[in-house]
A protein has these predicted regions:
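Vicinal oxygen chelate
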Residues: 1-7, 29-78, 84-111, 122-137
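Conserved beta-strand-loop-alpha-helix junction that forms the acyl-donor binding cleft
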Residues: 12-15, 102
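Helix N-cap motif at beta-to-alpha junctions
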Residues: 14-15, 78-80
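Conserved active-site tyrosine of GNAT-family acetyltransferases
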Residues: 18, 22-23, 87, 115
Length: 137
């Protein structure tokens, strides 16, 4: 038995407004489940899925506010400069430009419409790189 994938679940104060941001600014497509018992919207781009849920409050607290640091999601990617340029051209707030971290990842971070920080990363671990390549075949 092995684990296959993981999805981020983001509560949001305005599920439609947040969905529009992800579709228009980040290039995701949406699938709505608003008639389901637990209403949600799934967002897809390439092999990434994010799930939005309607929050019971008008304010969302990202990890950095709750715990002092940290992004709210890591998305493994490639062609980061192109992706950062794409987001920048669409007016997405880039809070950390593309850089190499002290743990040898290449990453940049954006802030979504609700204040969540999403990091787009290329992990430098050879094991991880080989694993990702093997799953794409």
């Amino acid at each position: 038995m092995k684990l296959i994938a993981s999805h981020c679940v983001f509560p949001t104060p305005d599920i439609q407004k947040t969905t529009e941001f992800y579709v228009e600014k980040l290039g995701f497509r949406r699938v709505e489940y608003l008639d389901a018992k637990e209403k949600h919207i799934c967002l897809y781009r390439d092999r990434v899925e994010l799930i939005l849920t309607q929050a019971n409050s008008q304010r969302i607290y990202p990890n950095r506010e709750l715990y002092g640091y940290g992004e709210d999601a890591y998305v493994i990617t490639e062609c980061q400069q192109e992706l950062q340029d794409e987001f920048g051209q669409k007016g997405v707030k880039i809070v950390r430009t593309l850089h190499k971290t002290d743990y040898n990842n290449l990453e940049f971070t954006i802030e979504d419409i609700d204040g969540m920080w999403i990091c787009f990363v290329i992990k430098q671990s050879l094991y991880f790189h080989d694993f990702v390549l093997s799953t794409l075949k």
